[in-house]
Amino acid sequence: LTQIALISDIHGNIPALEAVLKDIKQRGIETIYCLGDLIGKGPHGDIAVDMVRTHCQQVIKGNWDDFIGKETDDPVLQWHQHRLGSVRLQYLAELPYILEFMMSGKWIRLFHASPRSVYERIQPWDDQEKLETLFHSSPLCGDPRIADVAGYADIHNAYHQHLDGRTLFNTGSVGNPLEMPEASYVILDGIYDSEDPAPFNIQFIRVPYPIEQAVQDALESGMPSPKEYILEVRTGRYQVRKD
C-alpha cells in the first residue's frame, strides 16, 4: 500500500506548511505531491518554494506560480517577485501543469484548477456538466483517457463527490484555507502504479497551526497591505477576491 500526501495553496504561510509537514511525517508518509500556488498572498513564498523543493517529490504549477513570472506594474506582485528572486521564479516558471498515474486500478489525474488551465475556476456548487469536465483530458495532459479520479486545488475549499461512478475531490488549502482556519490536505491510499482493482481511499486532514505566528510573520515581513491576508488566515473567509 502506498500513501501519497497532497498539499496545495501554501501561499507563503510557513507556520501552516510546517504543521502539515510535521503531521505527514508523524503518519510515516514519505511521498508528498504539491498541487501549486506555493506563493502569493502570504509573506514567505521564498521559504515555501525552498521547503516544497526539499520535501515534495512532485510539484505542479498554480495560477500564482504562473503569473508571478510576468512583468508587472503591480507593487504587490513586484514585492513578491523581489522576495522570490530569479532562481525561484525560474523554478516556478518551469513547473508542469498535470500529474497522472495509476493507483489501485484507477487512472488518477491531478491539476491545480482544471485540466485545461490554471485560470479556470470551478466550484463544488457549479452545475454537474461543468464539474464533469474536470475528468476530461486536454492538450496539457500526457494521456487522453478520462480520469477515474480527478483531484485539484485552487479554490481553497476541500470537498469530495462522486459523479457517475467517478470521484472528484479538492485538497483545500494549506496556507489560506476557507471554511475553518485550519490547514487542509489530502492523503491518497492505494497501490501505486497498479492496474489491478484494489482498495483505494481518499482522506481529508485538517491541521491546526499557530495562526498568530502567521499573522506576526506577515506584519514583520513588510509585505504590502497585510490586513486582508491577516483577516483571511484568522477567519477562514476571503476578504477581497484577489485570489
Question: Language-model features: where?
Answer:
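Metallo-beta-lactamase
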Residues: 31, 125-133, 165-167, 171-177
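Acidic, His/Gly-rich catalytic cores of divalent-metal-dependent hydrolytic chemistry
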Residues: 162-243
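His/acidic metal-ligating clusters that form di-metal
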Residues: 28, 87-160
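Short amphipathic alpha-helical segments
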Residues: 18-19, 45-47, 122-123, 162-165, ...
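Active-site-proximal beta-strand elements of phosphoester/diester hydrolases
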Residues: 3-11, 107-114, 168-172
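Core catalytic region of metal-dependent phosphoesterases/phosphodiesterases
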Residues: 2-93
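Active-site environment of divalent metal-dependent phosphoester hydrolases
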Residues: 11-16, 40-42, 64-70, 116-118, ...
